[in-house]
Amino acid sequence: MHSELKVFSDQAPGRVEQHLTDKAAMARVLASAGIRYEQWQANQALSDDPQQDEVIQAYQADIDRLIADEGYQTVDVVSMVPDHPEKTAFRQKFLEEHRHSEDEVRFFVEGQGLFTLHINGKVYEVLCSKGDLISVPANTPHWFDMGPEPRFVAIRLFNNPDGWVANFTGSDIAQQFNRLA
């Protein structure tokens, strides 16, 4: 799996203005839009089916740095597999443009997901994969696609898990852009 960034005008969903696969270049473009994008490395090998404590321990230094920088209060690990009985419902839940009252911070331990951000007339499609951290600032319009056969393990950081409720914008813009196949 790879990571990539595609940038569009929100008025021209079929025309890619910028397409990047170099992670340093992706980080620069995203930073200019106020989005944190980093790569993390585990400080120890993970087992084949790691539990939450093992995953957090493997990335503890980066987690601690982010907590110190941003004041996050809660850390957990979420995973999704293709045979999850509610995968379709979970996918549908975040496919429409929405906002959260706090940052949405995700680090991909395994797998991938497509975050699409709608900022100042631009749409940023960020395909995140293993080793990628993305932090979507509070109140940024965005949507997320885990794909029809999702497979990922991600670390989540929160200020307040109750603040991570999706507030939908009512826009249909997400339907005009790419989804994971």
From Swiss-Prot:
Protein name: Acireductone dioxygenase
Organism: Alcanivorax borkumensis (strain ATCC 700651 / DSM 11573 / NCIMB 13689 / SK2)
Binding positions (Ni(2+)): 98, 100, 104, 142
Record: residues binding Fe(2+): 98, 100, 104, 142
Subunit structure: Monomer.
Reaction catalysed by this enzyme: 1,2-dihydroxy-5-(methylsulfanyl)pent-1-en-3-one + O2 = 3-(methylsulfanyl)propanoate + CO + formate + 2 H(+); 1,2-dihydroxy-5-(methylsulfanyl)pent-1-en-3-one + O2 = 4-methylsulfanyl-2-oxobutanoate + formate + 2 H(+)
GO MF entry, a single one: nickel cation binding
Pathway info: Amino-acid biosynthesis; L-methionine biosynthesis via salvage pathway; L-methionine from S-methyl-5-thio-alpha-D-ribose 1-phosphate: step 5/6
Lineage: Bacteria, Pseudomonadati, Pseudomonadota, Gammaproteobacteria, Oceanospirillales
InterPro entries, alphabetized: ARD (IPR004313), ARD_bac (IPR023956), RmlC-like_jellyroll (IPR014710), RmlC_Cupin_sf (IPR011051)
Encoding gene (name): mtnD
Site (May play a role in transmitting local conformational changes): 103
Entry note: cofactor: Binds 1 Fe(2+) cation per monomer.
